[in-house]
Amino acid sequence: MAELKLYPVGIQTFEEIITRNLLYVDKTEYVYRMTHSGGKHFFLSRPRRFGKSLLVSTFKSYFQGKKELFKGLAIEKLEKDWTEYPVLHFSMAGGKHMGKDQLERYLGNRLAEQEKVWGIKTPAVDANDRLISLIQTAYEKTGKQVVVLIDEYDAPLLDVVHEDAHLKDLRNVMRNFYSPLKDCEPMLRFVFLTGITKFSQMSIFSELNNITNISMDHEYAGICGITKEELETQMSADVDALAVKMNLTRAQTLDTLREFYDGYHFAAQSPDIFNPYSLLNAMAKSKLDYYWFTSGTPTYLIEMLKKFQVMPSDIGRCEADKSDFDAPTEMMVSIMPLLYQSGYITIKGYDPETELFTLDIPNKEIRVGLYRSLLPNYIGMTTPKGTTTIAKMSALIRRNDMDGALQMLQAFLATVPYCNQADSEGHYQQMMYVIFSILDNYVDVEVRTPSGRVDMVLRTATHLYLFELKLNKDAAAAMKQIDLKEYPKRFALSGLPIVKVGVNFDIATHNITDWKIEDYT
């Protein structure tokens, strides 16, 4: 077996990865393609921890003319002229959770770092004037056009996207900072911005009306992340090593990795793309886990779900027009663009006749991790007991012991605090939906039948469960409705034994009072 390189988990600097001989999945053909396309200003949107910062760092080393770092990579054979350019590299990643004054100081400090490099001792006052001065100085001192790289350009704004008043102040600060990039165009060789969202109305993109958004271009669909082909070729030995450690065949290992971390597509024509952060962590630790979610769940997403009153069962399969992806983030009427840009749903299909995209949750890691993060909205807290309860419920349901699973859920709900929204049947429906989704089973709500809608359908590997939920009634009433409406007939051809489940919740105790379970024959 080939000697394996160490994995650059959490390392986002291209030069360090190469000089330390860590694993690098070669993206330099994309670097060459973009820098020789004739354009100057480019923008790329990708989810967090998807390799954007490493890509920016790769551009930096390339434009600094560090040819020795690219030995053996695709660009070594493509690039004939390794010209060194002055590079201004800014990261906005540290500009989160700030007010207006603090953000202005943060930008000032980032500018001061560059001013020190270029010997500017008496900088201007305003951030935009200082950026202009930096570009002019670098251009005049070197006689070469300047490269500007801005990583996570939208980081200062994402946490306040749900706060209209606060967003306006911070947006004006950032707009002022970015505005020189258009006026300085003759002095610029290349401008590259990365982020999660496209703040169309932020005036960054109206000021930079010549910027090329490559986020959904099929030529760049695989520029970040790890494609299926890259996994099976550049990381082939790593897959074999993981298979040995997990006691699986190579094919089983690839299938398991695909189930957990694959499924992303960023264009109508896109290769299968794996989440790089989770994939590298899984390789490094020889264990599949929910690495992307444990690295942080953005609070802005949870707040936006609340703002738009999005139910957990609404997240998932949907259709969208191309224009929907460009909806201004701060003027959204739907949360779909933010869910897509943040990586919680992704492109799963495209119909060229209607020009409609089909989107859905990409993989098991996102599905389970997302619903885990939403669970506190329905049980009022995050608790280790909740995690262990759900794990035990999963084991019971796999054994077709729904009675035991509901007993466990009833006992758990008796220990959690009151939740303000727990006064409607819909609340309990969504709570059950979230819990069963965390168990990684197929679950759907309000499923149509010829005679009505089934509150919830749960499909496991061995059984199909039809749930009818009641509030302040009894389980017998729920079971009566299932029989009266003849819901099971709709699923007779499912190929699985059908189990009817009637559950009643009590608004006073916020818990299950009783349930009935019957096999359909």
What are these regions (language model features)?
Residues 177-184, 337-345, 433-437, 481-501:
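Metal-dependent nuclease catalytic cores in nucleic-acid-processing enzymes
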Residues 167-173, 471-488:
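Mg2+/Mn2+-dependent nuclease catalytic core
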Residues 1-424:
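Phosphate-binding site recognition
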Residues 490, 496-521:
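Domain-level recognition of nuclease-like catalytic cores that cleave nucleotide substrates
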